[in-house]
Amino acid sequence: MAYSAEDIAEHPNFVEALRDFAASLRQQFDDSPRLSRMLASHQRWLLSQAAFALQLEYDPSQPGSGLTTTNLREIITSNNAASRNTVLNFLDQLLSYKFVRIVGDPTRRPKRYEATEVTYQAVYLWLLANLLVLDRLDGGDRVATLRGRPELLRLVQPQIARRACLEPRWLEPPPRVALFLWTEAGGLVMDELVRRAVEPVPGGEAYEIGRIDARQLAEQFMISRTHLQRLFRRAVDAGCLSWPDDTRKNCLLNREFLREYCHWQAVKFSIVDRAYEQICGPVRLEKPEPRLGAVREA
């Protein structure tokens, strides 16, 4: 039976698995920064997942199916995730960066788009990374199954996208999480903070995450340093981040803020698990599932 969001959030292995997941996303960014930025805010994540699902769902016997501006707009604007103009600009960006291409006559309306090979590979790696988190919770065989049958991506991903675009808890992050996720490249920043959250301070109220160099991070993530500094100031005001002294050599990530983020991410992983189970059936376990009683502090 697929995990609930509550079971995932309370699992003793989840925080560590999520930290490694954030590190894997950072590696994907380093390998393909421009494409990774298409998933780097919550709005772009929703747009990207919906767009990829639509192009997979294309049916030649159904006129108007597939990834078109109209179809993407219907999904996205129905939950107020983006405006019509944002959808248009997003597709234009995908096309200009060659992450999608126009199928058939480019003068014909409506234009239909399909993902290019680099996009397929990126989504495949993204799904593997998500399934690996779930496998680390129960010793399951999700990753092995997808690697053995990569064509399952075409069936599982649309289920994830459709469910995600209908799940209120995923659509609306908690306020402090939204502070990052609704901003440009905020997902990249959040991944960077989470992957550093290894050492708790005495008392366990925060995690030491080292020095935050806004200039360096802004260059790496291809965003304005002013924008990033403003984001960090708001995060400090909201109690997400703090510095123990005036030297600012060692930033602290608030434990309760990390817990909020973990619970929100658990909603997504539950969606992924339910979608996987619907297509692939129950997961085969390779080792006993850890007891869910004692929750690891996050």
Residue ranges, per PLM feature:
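Short amphipathic alpha-helical interaction segments
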Residues: A81-S96, M222-V236
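Short acidic, hydrophobic short linear motifs in intrinsically disordered regions
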Residues: Y58-S78, P200-Q220
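Minor-groove-contacting beta-hairpin "wing" of winged helix-turn-helix DNA-binding domains
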Residues: T107-A115, T247-R255
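A short, conserved structural fragment
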Residues: L95-D105, V236-D246
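Exposed, interaction-prone assembly regions rather than primary DNA-binding/catalytic cores
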Residues: D138-E199, R284-A298
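Short, amphipathic alpha-helical interaction segments positioned at domain boundaries
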Residues: V118-R147, F257-K287
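N-terminal leader segment of winged-helix/HTH proteins
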Residues: M1-L35, D141-R162
